Amino acid sequence: MPILSTEIFNEADAGFVYQSNSNDYSDGFEGPEKKLDIRFGPISKGSVKSIAGSPSKVGLRTIDKEKWQTVLDSARCTIISQTSNDHMDSYVLSESSLFVYPRRAMIKTCGTTTLLHLIAKMVQVGKECGLEVEMVVFSRKNLNQPSKQVFPHCSFSDEVNFLNKIFDGQAYVMGDVNKDHWNLYIADFRKNPTLQRTEQTFEVMMHDLDETVMKQFFKREGVSAWDTTVNSGIADLLPGSMIDDFQFDPCGYSMNGLLNEFYWTIHITPESHCSYVSFDTNVALADYNQLLAKVLNVFKPGRFTAALYAEDGAPCGDPYTAFDVNVPSYAIQNKTVHGFDGGYDVVVSNYQQLDKKVNFSNDDLIQSIESTNIDLIQV
C-alpha cells in the first residue's frame, strides 16, 4: 500500500516543526475550512473490528469519543458534542465537524487548526480497526489570511508537499487563482476503481453575507442555539434531520445534521469584516437547484463558490448539470470541471451577486500554486 506506516512517519523526523497556535484573529476569524475525507477498506478478509451486540458499531465506529479526541488533538480542536444514528457518529467541534462511518471519516476544521497533522493518528486508528486507507481527499477554499496559518497550511504548495510525503496523490486548483478558487488533493488507492460508486458531496462556501441575517448568529441572552436554527430557516433546509447545533460566545454558529445515511453541516462566522458561511452535505439528490436556492435565500451571500464531487452512478448523474449555471440574482464568474480516471468528476463554480462589487482580500500567492500539478478545464 503506497502510504508510510505510522511506525516510521512522524512530523519531526520528516522535518515538520509545530508552531505555536496563537489564535491571532485580530483581523478576523478564518472561516474557510480545511476538509479531509479519508476512506478505508479491510486489511484482509474478516479483519474489520466490531462490537458484539452492536450491529452498527463496526470499523471506525468502534472508536469512542475519548480516542477521537486524542486524534483531534493533533489538529488543535476539541469535541463539543456528539450525536449518532444507525449509520454514523457526528461530532460538533470547537472548529467545525467530524463525521464517522464504519469505513470513512470526514473532518472539517477552520481557523488556524492543523488538520493535516492528524493523518498519522488516523492511519493508526484505522489499523486498530482492521482497516487500511483506500482514498484520501483534501480540499479547501482559498484563505483570507494564509500567512497566519500554521505549517503546512500557509500555502497549498506546502500542503501538497506535506501530503506527498505520506501519499502518492495529485493536486488541482479549480477557479481563478487571483480570486475565489478551490484547492483539491486526491490520492486514490482503491483496488477496483472501475466499479460503480455512488458517492456525491455538495458544498456552498459563502462570503459577504447579509448583515441583518448575520446578526442572528451573535449570542443573545435567552436565545438558544435551537431558537437560532429554527428562526434563521436552517431547520427547514433538509426537513426530518436530527440536528446538533451550537452557538458560540460572543458569536459564531455550528450545526451537524443527520438524515438517515447522509450528513449535512453548516458553520458561520458572522462578523461583517470577515463574514463566511459554509454548507456541506452528501445527501443524494438528482439535482441541487432547489437546495442551493434555499441555502442562498437563508444566508444571502454577496458571493459564493459551489463545489460538487460525484462518482459514476451517483443520483445527480452528470455533475456538470447538477446545479444550474444561471442562479437568480447572481452572475457566474467561472466554472471549472475535471474528470478523474477513478470514475468521478468535480465541478466548481464561482458566483457574485449582481448588485454587489466584491473586493477580494489577500490570497495564496500565485507562485506558491505554480509548484503544484495544476490540471483543469476552464469553461
UniProtKB/Swiss-Prot annotation:
Its EC number is 4.1.1.50. The record marks 95-96 as: Cleavage (non-hydrolytic). Keywords: Autocatalytic cleavage, Decarboxylase, Lyase, Polyamine biosynthesis, Pyruvate, S-adenosyl-L-methionine, Schiff base, Spermidine biosynthesis, Zymogen. PROSITE patterns: ADOMETDC. It catalyses: S-adenosyl-L-methionine + H(+) = S-adenosyl 3-(methylsulfanyl)propylamine + CO2. Binds 1 pyruvoyl group covalently per subunit. Heterotetramer of two alpha and two beta chains. It is an enzyme of class 4 (lyase). The modification Pyruvic acid (Ser) is found at residue 96. GO terms for cellular component: cytosol. It holds the Pfam family SAM_decarbox. The active site is at 30, 33, 96 (schiff-base intermediate with substrate), 110 (proton donor), 254 (proton acceptor), 267 (proton acceptor). This is S-adenosylmethionine decarboxylase proenzyme. S-adenosylmethionine decarboxylase is essential for the biosynthesis of spermine and spermidine. The alpha subunit contains the active site. Is synthesized initially as an inactive proenzyme. Formation of the active enzyme involves a self-maturation process in which the active site pyruvoyl group is generated from an internal serine residue via an autocatalytic post-translational modification. Two non-identical subunits are generated from the proenzyme in this reaction, and the pyruvate is formed at the N-terminus of the alpha chain, which is derived from the carboxyl end of the proenzyme. Gene3D superfamilies: S-adenosylmethionine decarboxylase. GO terms for molecular function: adenosylmethionine decarboxylase activity. One of its GO terms (biological process) is spermidine biosynthetic process. InterPro entries: AdoMetDC-like (IPR048283), S-AdoMet_decarboxylase_euk (IPR001985), S-AdoMet_deCO2ase_core (IPR016067), S-AdoMet_deCO2ase_CS (IPR018166). Belongs to the eukaryotic AdoMetDC family. Its cofactor is pyruvate. Pathway: Amine and polyamine biosynthesis; S-adenosylmethioninamine biosynthesis; S-adenosylmethioninamine from S-adenosyl-L-methionine: step 1/1.
